């Protein structure tokens, strides 16, 4: 944790959730008041549920976000969704550059940067994801990979108000594996140094989230690490009890 930076616990539902999932979201809304003093809460459901969830969340302690956007505001892009459309549906933040988008759809740093700028254009926060693969880690390339992703994916003009960085080691996502606390501290410290060097005072205030098999049993330990300002939670965010328990793990 970093003094004076309010933690953010963001849930990425990925390609999960139908109308019936509103019951879990309702439970999150009902329990949010108990953790509101510890952290901000954000849930990013599939695009099909954003409007319904945003309506439910109005005036409550849980914000609603999106998992991706197209860089353009409109046009002949069948199946894509503009940041403006997501904001219009009620999203207040958009995840961009998630490793699954980078791997499954071949998204590179330049496109991720454009998507972050699109989020800003729509008046919402960009959550930019970075992370190394197992092969890159084994080759000792972690910091070089992260430096390249940070340099290429973060737009000029990034501030603590419009951008969040999420570090997700690709090898830890959905595997049950997590880096050691020492590894997390080293990498988040490296990210903080990069952000402060490039964005000065704002870089020192930006939230840096940890993601990758975050669960109630390890949340408190991870959230206590210096320069960890919250979590990007995958599978555990699908259950209200787990999601809220992770938030309770914040100092």
From Swiss-Prot:
One of its GO terms (molecular function) is triose-phosphate isomerase activity. One of its GO terms (cellular component) is cytosol. CDD domains: TIM. PANTHER family: TRIOSEPHOSPHATE ISOMERASE. Belongs to the triosephosphate isomerase family. The active site is at 98 (electrophile), 168 (proton acceptor). GO terms for biological process: gluconeogenesis; glyceraldehyde-3-phosphate biosynthetic process; glycerol catabolic process; glycolytic process. PROSITE patterns: TIM_1, TIM_2. The keyword Cytoplasm applies. This is Triosephosphate isomerase. It holds the Pfam family TIM. Substrate binds at residues 12-14, 174, 213, 234-235. Its main location: cytoplasm. Pathway: Carbohydrate biosynthesis; gluconeogenesis; Carbohydrate degradation; glycolysis; D-glyceraldehyde 3-phosphate from glycerone phosphate: step 1/1. Disulfide bonds: none annotated. It catalyses: D-glyceraldehyde 3-phosphate = dihydroxyacetone phosphate. Involved in the gluconeogenesis. Catalyzes stereospecifically the conversion of dihydroxyacetone phosphate (DHAP) to D-glyceraldehyde-3-phosphate (G3P). It comes from the Bacteria. InterPro entries: Aldolase_TIM, TIM_sf, TrioseP_Isoase_bac/euk, Triosephosphate_isomerase, Triosephosphate_isomerase_AS. Coiled coil: none annotated. It is an enzyme of class 5 (isomerase). Keywords: Cytoplasm, Gluconeogenesis, Glycolysis, Isomerase. Homodimer. It is found in: Cytoplasm. Its EC number is 5.3.1.1.
């Amino acid at each position: 944790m970093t003094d004076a930076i309010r933690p953010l616990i963001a849930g990425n539902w990925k390609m999960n959730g139908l109308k019936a999932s509103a019951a879990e979201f309702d439970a999150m809304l009902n329990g949010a008041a108990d953790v509101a003093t510890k952290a901000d809460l954000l849930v990013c459901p599939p695009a099909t549920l954003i409007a319904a969830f945003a309506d439910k969340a109005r005036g409550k302690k849980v914000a609603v976000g999106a998992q991706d956007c197209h860089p353009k505001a409109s046009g002949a892009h069948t199946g894509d969704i503009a940041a403006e459309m997501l904001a219009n549906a009620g999203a207040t933040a958009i995840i961009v550059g998630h490793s699954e988008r980078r791997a499954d759809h071949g998204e590179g740093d330049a496109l991720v940067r454009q998507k972050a700028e699109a989020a800003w254009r729509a008046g919402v926060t960009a959550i930019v994801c970075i992370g190394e693969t197992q092969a890159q880690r084994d080759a000792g390339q972690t910091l070089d990979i992260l430096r390249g992703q940070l340099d290429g994916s973060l737009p000029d003009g990034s501030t603590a108000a419009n951008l969040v960085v999420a570090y997700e080691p690709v090898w830890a996502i959905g595997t049950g594996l997590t880096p050691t606390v020492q590894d997390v501290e080293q990498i988040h410290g490296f990210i903080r140094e990069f952000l402060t060097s490039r964005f000065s005072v704002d870089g020192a205030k930006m939230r840096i989230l940890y993601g990758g098999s975050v669960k109630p049993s390890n949340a408190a330990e991870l959230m206590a690490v210096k320069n960890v300002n919250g979590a990007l939670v995958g599978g555990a965010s699908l259950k209200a009890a787990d999601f809220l328990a992770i938030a309770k793990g914040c100092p």
